[in-house]
Structures are given as C-alpha cells and as structure tokens.
C-alpha cells in the first residue's frame, strides 16, 4: 500500500472561517499536490508554533481544502455512485457510502483473499465490470489499478497456480472507493470465486502525518473494543495466528516503541521491531505509510466488506482525534458504532450481523 493521507487528527486551532485561512489551506493543498512534504509546507506557510514546524497542522490544512473540494462536487459524486449501484446490484452499499462520504475522506486500500478461479478469469471479470485490473507476480508495489497476486497462505483449489489468490486495490477514498470495492468483490463472486477459513480481508488506512501517540490511541481504541468487534466476525478470526490479539504486554511494547515518536522517521524506527501478524499491524507503516487491520474473515459480499472498511476508517478517525485519557471500552457494539459516528445503515447492518452470529455460536 502507498503512503496514504489521513483526514483527521487532534482538534486544530486553525480558524477555518476566515478568507485568509481558506487561502492558506488552498495553498497548502497546491504545494502538497506539487509533491512538497508536510514539514516543508509547515515551514513555508507558517504552521510553526513556538518556532517549530508542525507537519500535522499542514496536513490538517490540506485535508480542509480537500473536503471543500469534495463537498463542492458532492452532487457529481452522488450521481456517480448511483450509476455504479444501478449497474452492479450494490445499491444498499452505494447509498450508505453517499450518506457518509463527506465524513470519510481518509484514504484506504483493501486486500481480499480468495480462490476458486484462475487469475485470468479474475482479471477478465473485473475488466468486464469496468475495473482496471492486472494479474501480477507477488509484490508489494502500489498500482493505479487493481491487481491479482498469489498468496501461499490461501486455499489453492481452482486457481491453477498452486496457491490462493489475493485482490489488492489501488488507493481508494470515500463514496467512490466504497462503491468500487463492492463492485470488485461482486464481480469476482459472480465469476465463481470462493472464500473459506484460510481467507482474510486486510484493510490499510492512511496514517501519514500521524504521531506515535495518535497511532497508539487508534490501536488502544480497537483493543479496548475488540470484544464488540468480535461479535460481527467469524469464529475462525477470533483466535487467528495471522491476526493475533493484543495482550497487556503487547500494548506496553507498542507504547514503549511509539510514545515519543513525532515524525515519520521516529515512527518507522519504533515500528520496526513490532510484530506484524496482529489484529492491528503497525509495521505496515514502514513500507506503506498505513495502519493495517487484519482481523476480518474472507468475504465477497459487497455490503459486508464495505461496512467493515467504513468501521475501520471510523476507528482511525476517532482514535486519532481523541485525547489520551478518553480512549475507553464503550460497553457494546451499538454504543461503540454510535461513538464512531457510523451512518445508520452501516450500524444496522453490523447489529443485524452480530445478532445472526450470536444465534449460531
């Protein structure tokens, strides 16, 4: 996954209601699109409290300008998502995506493991659905297209290549990203792809600009509410060697590694010694600039996948914006999803999913 861009951190002191502030935010966005680093934008535009450049403030300014752009194009986005829904039979997913698009501007990517069809069949199915895709050998390169790669940990039946397969997205964002994700998995399902207990879904969410303390809060928020998230997950993912849960010692190791990390180099240095196969994988920051969430089981159900992605993004948003002492166990799935600010359709889906699974356990 690439160096994605988050959309919310601690509450900013920037006054967004003045012409000067808007102009400075627009200039920050222009500089960022030219490739300038956040710390250099902070220096150039004066985001320097106490004389120290603050890249987080520059990132907030960029996101504020991006949100204005997105809101101004909301009608076009809604029409685009509606058109996708009409042609791919994922209208419920698209409708929920539109409802929450303005709030969910953080970039994300998905990795979805499957088997049952060959890479060629998978690419053809995606292409027929209007999705740019290619089959590639195993790699960690970020592409502008969806890619099909091999995965030795996944059931190989029907793939013709001696291993399972993984669908890896390009960088995605907001309503269009949700709709395209649903469209992609629906295309694979209709082509004959399958999932079983060997398959998982990994969600990467952009973390560029975050501090070590921000990342700790995100992980802590997930961990403290892990039992509530478990209620919507398959039993095979509750104690899984590829997505292990944090115990007290693991959380303390995370805090020790990241609590003083303020910049990219600090976070990379701290994350380097941490374990990868956790429900929340911080080591993905080293290669991709993301935090990876690994717990969800494999699925080719568009509504299920998108509901989980939206939940994960909301956890990133909430954790990054909280104060250290505010992270807590919210007591139930419903209370947690309410605190996350999820849209009603996603909350209803998750609650219904939890009820269904509770009856089978």
Residue ranges and their predicted role:
Residues 193-199, 203-205:
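Hydrophobic alpha-helical segments and helix pairs
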Residues 81-194, 208-361:
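C-terminal accessory/tail domains of diverse enzymes
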Residues 33-45, 199-202:
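Short, charged amphipathic recognition helices of the HTH superfamily
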Residues 19-36:
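Short, amphipathic alpha-helical "recognition" segments used to contact nucleic acids or chromatin
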Residues 39, 44-64:
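Short, basic interhelical loop/turn and adjoining N-cap
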């Amino acid at each position: 996954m690439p160096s994605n861009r988050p959309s919310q951190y601690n509450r900013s002191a920037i006054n967004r209601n003045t012409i000067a502030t808007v102009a400075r935010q627009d200039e920050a966005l222009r500089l960022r699109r030219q490739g300038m680093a956040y710390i250099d934008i902070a220096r150039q535009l004066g985001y320097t409290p106490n004389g120290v450049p603050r890249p987080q403030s520059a990132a907030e300014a960029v996101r504020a300008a991006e949100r204005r752009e997105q809101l101004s194009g909301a009608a076009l986005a809604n029409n685009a998502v509606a058109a996708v829904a009409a042609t791919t039979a994922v209208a419920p997913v698209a409708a929920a995506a539109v409802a929450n698009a303005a709030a969910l501007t953080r970039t994300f990517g998905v990795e979805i493991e499957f088997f049952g069809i060959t890479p060629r069949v998978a690419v053809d199915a995606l292409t027929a659905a209007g999705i740019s895709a290619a089959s590639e050998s195993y790699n960690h390169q970020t592409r502008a297209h969806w890619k099909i790669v091999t995965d030795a940990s996944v059931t190989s039946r029907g793939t013709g290549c001696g291993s399972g397969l993984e669908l890896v997205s390009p960088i995605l964002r907001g309503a269009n990203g949700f709709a395209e994700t649903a469209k992609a998995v629906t295309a694979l399902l209709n082509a004959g792809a399958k999932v079983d207990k060997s398959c998982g879904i990994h969600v990467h969410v952009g973390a560029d600009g975050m501090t070590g303390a921000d990342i700790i809060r995100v992980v802590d928020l997930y961990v403290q509410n892990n039992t509530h998230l478990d209620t919507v997950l398959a039993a095979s993912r509750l104690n899984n060697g590829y997505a292990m849960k944090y115990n007290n010692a693991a959380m303390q190791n995370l805090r020790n590694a990241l609590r003083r990390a303020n910049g990219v180099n600090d976070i990379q240095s701290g994350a380097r010694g941490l374990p990868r196969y956790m429900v929340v994988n911080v080591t993905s920051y080293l290669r991709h600039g993301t935090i990876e969430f690994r717990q969800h089981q494999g699925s080719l159900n568009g509504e299920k996948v998108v509901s989980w992605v939206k939940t994960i993004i909301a956890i990133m948003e909430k954790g990054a914006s909280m104060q250290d002492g505010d992270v807590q166990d919210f007591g139930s799935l419903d209370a947690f999803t309410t605190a996350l600010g999820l849209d009603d359709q996603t909350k209803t889906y998750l609650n219904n999913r939890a009820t269904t699974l509770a009856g089978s356990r």
